[in-house]
Amino acid sequence: ILRRFPLEAGVNPQFVEIDERAQNLLLDEVVEAIADGQGQSSFDGIAEHFTGPDLQKFLHAILNLDHHFDSHPDADGIWKALDLPAGYDDASLAQECFLPGDFQHIEELKALLMTKDENSNDFKAGLRLQAIPGPELTTADLPTLESVFLNKTGKAPGSAKIGSFPTKATRAELPGMAQVEALMLRVEAGRQSRLSLNVARRSLALYDFAAEFLGTYRARKQARGFLDFNDLIMRTRHLLSDERVATWVLFRLDGGIDHILVDEAQDTSPAQWDVIRLLAQEFTSGEGARAD
């Protein structure tokens, strides 16, 4: 269809369809250009959060969801969407969760826990607390503190283990137990803010990188007259949906299509189904309707 109506579809008449291998080579080229060029900050930002082993899979996911990146919310917009105050950061979170002297109370708790039986939950908790280096508590310590101080399951997951950790006997031995329990409650209260801040940062990094990546990818495709598979589908759908030219295109196609073969891979592709629907309408309506 695009070969027959390139001007109506807004594509280069000499466009080149690129296969998956050629596309992957282009993706590598684009990422390298971003990492070494003006978009380096966006690359560094996503690299800080991306932990998957398959970069190509990640890039293809962005391409498949490119319409979600048409608008680029700023940091304030993302923070607001996650119920975080503008400018909320690690310092804000630390101020909510920690008080001077908290690390000393953790050190005292840790020392006591490490004296318990090696098979006890108290001792195992002490081992986890060894991951906190000091000399003060920071937001980087919150996941460790949450793993020790908060319930993972039960009626109230994420709630502080007040009255249940450490064991009753150990609690009686710890002079600063009241201060530890106060810290437990602050860790509980700060958990949602920590998670939201993490999502906000990852979202901002993703939007920044996607904008740079998609812009560079599209520019390089256009300069070389390339169309990838998604381009073929989206351009065809737009062509058949454009009221200015769709009737003319379908009229010219009438008689040239006897059947539509649907591959099972299209079951999960709404855009491809749109193309099929638009083509099928010509079989069943208007002057082009088929008796059979």
Predicted regions located by residue number:
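A structural signal for alpha-helix termini and helix-coil/disorder junctions
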Residues: R4, A33-Q40, L65, T115, ...
